[in-house]
Every structure is written in C-alpha cells, then in structure tokens.
C-alpha cells in the first residue's frame, strides 16, 4: 500500500476516520498510534455541530478530503488527511444536497436540479446554467 487508505464511517455517534492498514493488526482510527486504545468519541476532530451531520458523500484525493454533510454549510474540507477541517460551501443554495463528483482539478456538487462546480477545493462555486430534472447522483465522464 503506497500510503494510508482512509475510510470514513458514519456511525450513530458521529463520523469516524479509519486508516486501513496492510493487515488487520495495523487498522486504526486516523491519527492514533498503532496499539493505542480506541476511544468511542473520536469523531473526525470536527466541531460538535459538524459531527452531528451525516456524511452523504466523500471526495478524497491524496491528503485532501471533501465531505458532503446533511446540514448547513453542506461541505467541510481537509487538506491534511483529516487532521483539521474548514467549512466550505457557504455560497451554495439552501436545499437538499445530493452528491459530490470526483475530478483531479474540480469538485462537483449537486443539489436538487442544479449542478455547481468549484476549481479551488470548494471556496468559490459556479452554478452551471442548465437546469436538470431532480438529480440522484453525479460522476465526471
């Protein structure tokens, strides 16, 4: 394995970052030393309001992770593999968030019947002009 594989697990008491090791003995909650005791209250290191949100989708490339949450603002971004997080998406419209689309240079966000694209990790967003029927999922072609 080239680097740690990070899995985000939405659980009853929050969202957990889990590092998948080369073997079961090496699996751990992200940021923990191997063999350290696992504490139940290790949700992502996010503020309590963020941890209360349910993760709807994830876009992860290298050390950058974008989470789509079921709350406002709908996005949180980490550029250090989940150690620190920043709220993003304040300019996105209210309403039900649907999905994120992965791309090496852009983040795609879908809400109801409109797509929004960001080329800077979610700081600024541009709504695409076309209006679609209700969107259920997105992917780059």
Residues of each region from the PLM?
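Extracellular glycan-interacting surfaces
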Residues: 1-141
